[in-house]
Swiss-Prot record:
Residues 65-90 form a coiled coil. Keywords: Cell cycle, Cell division, Coiled coil, Cytoplasm, Cytoskeleton, Microtubule, Mitosis, Repeat, Transport, WD repeat. This is Nuclear distribution protein PAC1. Pfam families: WD40. It comes from Scheffersomyces stipitis (strain ATCC 58785 / CBS 6054 / NBRC 10063 / NRRL Y-11545) (Yeast). Belongs to the WD repeat LIS1/nudF family. Self-associates. Interacts with NDL1 and dynein. GO terms for biological process: cell division; establishment of mitotic spindle orientation; microtubule sliding. The gene is PAC1.
Length: 524
């Protein structure tokens, strides 16, 4: 009998006895089974064997459970090492005063290493990935039209919780509703989070995230649907953009397209939505959004466009990229403190920006947006200040009067070696995450603007073997269950600190990436 080159003779004998011990209860019921057992016994433990020692009961099962316990212990220790390494990295991020200080508080949590990998099949490139708004569940949209769901607390990442055969062609985007909704308008039913998927098969589909039930299909686009985003002010509305150059607004209750407008001359790649209702404010968590939503879109025409959703009116154009723009996002209001300080202290660099505009409260009290960030095939990310629209009572907003309705480029984020395909924003508004075809994720610190005058990459995450197509940082619950108020006499700094404390208590330290290497990675 050929001996294992890995095990010693003693270990080989113990393994053979354990196999016989495990099989014995199954092979003693019939005469034929007993014959099989005797044959195995002759092979595994022949009479000539020098070892006659017995082994403990349930030897194989006990060995197996011990291995599993040790594997879990190794994972726990690896996570602990990763956490300690991130703390050391944070302490070393200050070098001769040339970088901003990153504290070890939870509010500044940053991913450091891939702790879990969720694989798909060979023909399932991950094109979109998203984290459930409240549950430890992640969703991946694949190139074959499948939506795959994993529970991240499960030890076996190779077994998904659900596979949904959603579309006939590649999925381009997955998006969750801002809050639970009931599209049936049946008051007796409990509300649940819904999510939307859009595809190259020209359709958008709406799903119940608790049962994975298909609710509705939206059709009307004439070409690939690139991206979708839920309304911030109306939970029943969804926005979509397409290669047919249009932006469409959908009523999810009846499935009708209620508005369609064209603002770009080529393929519209991405969309993000903002309203005064979406901007976190401790003084009033649910502000009435009289103007409704504002949307920002990007296109193959190398421009970023800010529009008023209800009227479709173009309000501002951001020009500066030299190639296709893949992604764009509004920055949250919590980012304003950092960027406002930079503009106020460096006014000479931006003579065309009126000083009073930087401090204008219209952005937070009326509009819900001020800055945005875009990334494209020129390997760059760009930070923009968006000029406010012209507001006339009882009329839709009109194009901005400042700077000929064009936005101001504040800073370029330089570091990627290939196309920037994904952008995510940290809940604290300070850190930007970008994913690229160079197979890396970069973490950018906006606070460096006020130290070095540029946005520095403070961390590069490597681990994927393919183009990175999507990123997501877990959302946090804006509803606190109690009234959160800022003192009327609080200074701007005190207000900001209280806002950070609010976010810190509700943020979830979950960050994922989806890539063309057939995997989603969870970073810790």
């Amino acid at each position: 009998m050929n001996r294992s080159q890995i095990l010693t003779d003693r270990q080989q004998q113990e393994l053979n006895k354990a196999i016989l011990q495990y099989l014995e209860p199954m092979l003693t019921e019939s005469s034929s089974d007993q014959e099989v057992y005797r044959s195995l016994q002759q092979i595994l433990v022949p009479p000539s064997s020098s070892s006659s020692e017995a082994i403990v009961d349930n030897y194989l099962e006990k060995k197996w459970s011990t291995v599993l316990r040790l594997q879990r212990k190794i994972i726990d220790l690896e996570n602990e090492v990763g956490t300690l390494r991130s703390i050391v990295d944070g302490q070393q991020s200050v070098s001769n005063g040339a970088a901003s200080v990153i504290s070890k508080d939870r509010i500044n949590w940053l991913p450091n290493r891939a702790s879990k990998s969720f694989p798909t099949q060979q023909n399932q490139l991950v094109m979109a990935s998203v984290i459930h708004p409240v549950l430890p569940v992640i969703f991946g949209g694949c190139s074959d039209g499948s939506i795959i769901v994993w529970n991240i607390v499960n030890d076996d990442t190779s077994i998904p919780e659900k596979i949904i055969r959603a579309h006939t062609r590649s999925i381009n985007k997955l998006a969750f509703s801002v809050e639970p909704a009931d599209l049936s308008k049946d008051l007796t039913k409990s509300k649940t989070y819904i999510f939307a998927s859009c595809s190259a098969d020209l359709s958008i589909k709406i799903w119940d995230s608790s049962s994975y039930r298909h609710i509705r299909t939206l059709t009307g686009h004439d070409h690939t649907v690139s991206s979708v985003a839920f309304s911030q002010s109306n939970p029943d509305h969804l926005y979509s953009v397409s290669r047919d150059k249009t932006v469409k607004i959908w009523d999810l209750v009846n499935g009708y397209c209620v508005k369609s407008f064209t603002g770009h001359s080529e393929w519209v790649r991405d969309i993000d939505v903002a309203s005064v209702n979406s901007q976190l404010s401790l003084n009033n968590m649910k502000v009435s959004a009289e103007l409704g939503d504002f949307v920002v879109t990007c296109s193959n025409d190398q421009s970023v466009r800010v529009s008023h959703a209800e009227s479709g009116a173009g309000l501002a154009l951001l020009i500066g990229h030299t190639h296709v723009i893949e992604k764009v996002k509004f920055l949250p209001a919590v980012s304003n403190t950092i960027l406002d300080k930079f503009l106020k202290e460096n006014h000479a660099q931006f003579p065309s920006i009126p000083q009073e505009l930087v401090s204008d409260e219209i952005f937070t009290t009326t509009l819900g947006y001020k800055y945005c960030i875009s990334g494209g095939r020129d390997n760059l990310l760009k930070l923009w200040l968006i000029p406010p629209p012209t507001l006339i009572p009882h009329r839709s907003p009109l194009p901005a009067q400042h700077n000929n309705s064009q936005g101001w480029a504040i800073a370029d984020l330089v570091g990627h070696q290939s196309w920037v395909k994904a952008i995510a924003i940290h809940p604290n508004g300070r850190f930007i995450f970008s994913g690229s075809d160079d197979k890396t994720i970069k973490v950018w610190d906006l606070a460096n603007l006020n130290v070095t005058g540029s946005v520095k990459c403070v961390r590069t995450l490597s681990g994927h073997d393919g183009f990175i197509n999507d990123l997501d940082f877990a959302a946090f619950n804006r509803d606190s269950g109690k009234e959160d108020k800022i003192k009327e006499d609080a200074t701007e700094e005190e207000s900001h600190q209280q806002l950070m404390k609010f976010i810190e208590g509700r943020m979830r330290c979950l960050f994922i990436s989806g890539a063309a290497d057939n995997s989603i990675k969870l970073w810790s």
